[in-house]
A protein has these predicted regions:
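A surface-exposed partner-binding patch
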Residues: 1-105
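Phosphate-binding glycine-rich loops and adjacent basic patches that engage nucleotide phosphates
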Residues: 2-7, 110-118
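Short, flexible beta-strand-to-coil junctions
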Residues: 47, 99-106, 113-117, 125-130
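A short, terminal or domain-edge coil/loop segment
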Residues: 71, 75, 97, 110-113, ...
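A short pocket-lining beta-strand/turn micro-motif at the edge of beta-sheets
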Residues: 94, 118-121
Length: 158
């Protein structure tokens, strides 16, 4: 399944905001084009995801922790990527911050952006993952869903 099909099935439940032209310009000014593939920008322009709260049960979360996540605004994405850890290190590895944990940890959620994948996995990168050299051991990153489309198919929307 692809992301757009998955989003079309839940479109009526999405109560967030779509990406504005001003926010689009803000994103492309501050983040690398590699982190902002066309499919991702189009998704944010077409679907009101910004500010939506998504939940996923522990059973459906591949990390077995469960998800209670808010989809970040473009301003929050840029802040997480450029001003806060683990985002500062994660973007160097190709991870784009897209969500924040609402359960209490505040751990950010990311998509692994690569040129050849238009349905990346959704991962959680805990704040305490950085080693003493401020590096991330990618084997410690918590995979939540093997694809974003699968996450949209499996989640509940608050």
């Amino acid at each position: 399944m692809n992301i757009r099909f998955a989003l079309d099935t839940i479109r009526g439940q999405l109560s967030g905001l779509k990406l504005s032209n001003e926010e689009y310009n803000f994103l492309i000014t501050h983040l690398s084009p590699i982190l902002l593939p066309d499919w991702f920008i189009k998704m944010l322009l077409d679907y009101p995801l910004i500010g939506v709260n998504f939940t996923l049960s522990e059973i459906l979360d591949e990390s077995d922790l469960g998800v209670d996540m808010e989809w970040l605004s473009p301003k929050q994405m840029v802040e997480e990527a450029l001003e806060f850890y683990p985002g500062i290190v994660a973007i160097q590895l190709g991870y784009l911050p897209i969500g924040s944990c609402l359960i209490g940890s505040g751990d950010p959620y990311f998509l692994k952006m690569t040129l050849d994948n238009d349905d990346p996995s959704l991962v959680r990168i805990p704040h305490d993952i950085l080693d003493e050299n401020e590096k991330i051991d990618e084997s410690e990153i918590e995979q939540v869903c093997f694809s974003l489309s699968h996450f949209f198919e499996s989640c509940q929307i608050d």
